[in-house]
């Protein structure tokens, strides 16, 4: 079945084909047309498209980032040149089976496929978000419940350029690692902060004492009654050393037995 997508532009309209409308998703294609000339401007094949009707119609420009409903066609200015571009869904190929898009930038000669912008809509979690006021594009990617990365980009020479990223990593609970990277005008500068959450539900018991001479705390703790760990924190509460560094569910170097 083929549906027309309209109402998002005075210049353009879209068409989308679903091979099977009895399913929530199916393969198909998405096309963009010039309203005056009826010329087909963009065609994108998709291995999977979401079939969401609103009052019997398909709507454009719905983007519930990162995992909510997404239209198969988005029409927005992505490179901040004052001209609206197109994001066309080509499946659910982003992280955790999230929607993925191909990006076509407006030019003097029509719409041109952008590999660099498309990667931002393929390799992360869903479609990227756009802050028009500050001219920033943002992406998010994750691995399970305990690792997330948030990145910001500006646009230079019609290409996205990474200017900052923030990563939080709690995969080795109760050790938490925060990593920030910022562009200083010449290079990316990385800052890493490591802390310990003694209130973690995984810590069954801990013992802490202070060493005045070096102004540091020594912490011994037990995770899930499996192993004895220790950590050294400085006067700012940052972890300078912890041992062992492996997950508590890997083979321990030594055991703690009451």
Where are these predicted regions, by residue range?
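Acidic, small-residue rich beta-repeat scaffolds with periodic aromatic anchors
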Residues: 1-40, 130-204
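Beta-propeller blade termini
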Residues: 2-5, 67-78, 123-136
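N-terminal secretory signal peptides
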Residues: 12-14, 199-245
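Structural motif
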Residues: 26-28, 95-102, 145-152, 226-230
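Beta-propeller blade repeat segments, especially FG-GAP/WD-type strand-to-loop junctions
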Residues: 33-36, 96-116, 150-157
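A low-complexity, Ser/Thr/Gly/Pro-enriched, surface-exposed linker/loop concept
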Residues: 48-60, 229-257
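Acidic carboxylate motifs that coordinate Ca2+ or other divalent cations, activating on Asp/Glu
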Residues: 81
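Hydrophobic beta-strand segments that make up the repeating blades of beta-propeller
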Residues: 86-90
